Amino acid sequence: MVESLFSGEFLAMAGAAMAALAGIGSAIGVGVAGEAAAGVVSEDPNKFGQVLLLQALPGTQGIYGLLIAFLVMVKVGLLGGDGMIELTMIQGAGIFAASLPVGLVGIFSGVAQGKAAAAGIMLVGKKPSELAKGMLFAAMVETYAVLALLISFLMLNSIQV
């Protein structure tokens, strides 16, 4: 039993789970932005479309994590139909390490982007013509989530299985 917990296959699946943790950041970020959006829409229902756009921005981290988790599962044969391939501890650890950037950065950047989006939503509440500025503030945080996605993708593709 203990041997199966410390196998390459286990580490690879733990890596896929780690990548999927980016969804936590997205869930919190979208929730924070949603709270701000509800306040603005309660004052002016016509601003719903503008604030919904800003509320959706923190959701991308979860998508990035899901993408890397799927790529891990495809790489190890879990989604290919032939069954999971045997992995060495080094291969499993490499896959786990490759999943860390998108998972960890996704958690923190999703929350930070939610706060930036909430501030942008409040800006739109007072000055609807400033939507682009509010989006830019939130998009600045997105840069780091995209960089983490790129790092995870490149690391994952460098591992030979």
Positions of PLM-derived features:
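Hydrophobic, small-residue-rich transmembrane alpha-helices and their short perimembrane loops
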Residues: 1-161
